[in-house]
């Protein structure tokens, strides 16, 4: 397991949050290989990646504000994600250059292909290895309009880039590198082979696979997206639930084994919550069990803290 501290958004970084994360992991009985990687120390790598994208003509300056984009776009698929309408993509090269020289505030966006969708990207296969091989073959012949991958939990995924994602920001107008570029560069540099995260990032996976291809990589990690955890009122878990903050639980004297066991139960790996260590959980783990129930989970605080 690799530990990466994603502190690239400097204005939002909380002092000592990295140490809290490490302390929480240690308390749960989890460790990681090697030193933690800090994104704030890898700005040169992101700058180099952006330079390569610019050399290939795959990015362009965008002068639109968030208000401009909201006014010109409709939310996609009811989830609030805005598809950039391509306003600045249609500007002439001369107009783009003159506005940059003039100092107009701008971000940098990555171009996604237009044209007929490419269908041979692995979506027809439900097998992870078959999908990966098809994806590699399709990426080898050029930049795809359609990105597909087989998820360990949610199965085959297919994203039409211009229709569902649009030209994504890789450097923000405030000069900070965007999450999608930074994590893609880091995953390649760190040799990440398996990524497990929430289902709300399925769309991000398609973006990141495309970013990787634009940077010359056809390798595809194995992905597993998990159901989200909701509070009892049906809303997503948030920091407002201080009682479930791991640091607060540790200070309160709660048993970390109870947390691990409860998570195992949420993932349908055990029939009922019971205290266990990560080492005791390992032989019980099964992706088939996790994938058998993809509904979001609701946390019962009383059950967890009893």
Label every PLM stretch briefly:
Residues 1-78, 200, 204-218, 276-280:
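N-terminal Rossmann-like or analogous alpha/beta NTP/dinucleotide-binding catalytic cores
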Residues 18, 43, 66, 81, ...:
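Alpha-helix initiation and N-capping motif
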Residues 27, 75, 94, 214, ...:
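A structural signal for alpha-helix termini and helix-coil/disorder junctions
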Residues 31, 59-60, 78-82, 94, ...:
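A general structural signal for well-ordered secondary-structure junctions
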Residues 41-56, 78-86, 106-117, 265-280:
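Short secondary-structure transition/capping segments
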Residues 54-64, 117-119, 127-130, 144-145, ...:
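A short, terminal or domain-edge coil/loop segment
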Residues 67-238, 245-250, 306:
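Active-site cores that bind ATP or allylic diphosphates and position pyrophosphate for catalysis
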Residues 115-116, 235-306:
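Non-catalytic terminal extensions that flank enzyme cores
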């Amino acid at each position: 397991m690799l530990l990466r501290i994603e502190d690239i958004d400097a204005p939002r970084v909380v002092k000592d949050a990295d140490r809290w994360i490490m302390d929480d992991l240690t308390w749960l009985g989890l460790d990681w290989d090697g030193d933690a990687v800090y994104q704030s120390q890898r700005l040169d790598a992101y700058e180099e990646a952006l330079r390569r994208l610019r050399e290939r003509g795959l990015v362009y300056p965008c002068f639109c504000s968030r208000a401009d984009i909201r006014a010109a776009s409709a939310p996609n698929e009811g989830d609030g994600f805005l598809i950039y309408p391509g306003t600045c993509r249609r500007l002439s090269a001369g107009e783009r250059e003159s506005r940059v020289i003039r100092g107009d505030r701008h971000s940098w966006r990555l171009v996604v292909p237009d044209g007929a969708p490419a269908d041979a990207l692995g979506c027809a296969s439900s097998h992870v290895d078959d999908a990966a091989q098809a994806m590699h073959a399709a990426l080898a012949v050029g930049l795809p309009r359609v990105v597909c991958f087989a998820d360990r939990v949610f199965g085959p995924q297919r994203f039409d880039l211009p229709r569902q994602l649009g030209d994504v920001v890789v450097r923000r107008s405030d000069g900070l590198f965007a999450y999608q570029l930074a994590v893609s560069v880091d995953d390649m540099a760190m040799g990440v082979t398996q990524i497990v995260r929430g289902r709300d990032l399925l769309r991000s996976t398609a973006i990141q696979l495309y970013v990787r291809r634009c940077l010359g990589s056809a390798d595809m990690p194995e992905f597993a997206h998990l159901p989200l955890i909701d509070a009892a009122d049906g809303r997503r878990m948030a920091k407002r639930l201080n009682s479930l903050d791991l640091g607060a639980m540790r200070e309160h004297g709660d048993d970390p084994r109870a947390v691990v066991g409860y998570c195992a139960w949420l993932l349908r790996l055990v029939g009922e919550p019971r205290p266990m260590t990560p080492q005791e959980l390992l032989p019980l783990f099964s992706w088939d069990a996790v994938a058998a129930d993809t509904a979001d989970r609701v946390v019962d605080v009383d059950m967890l803290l009893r």
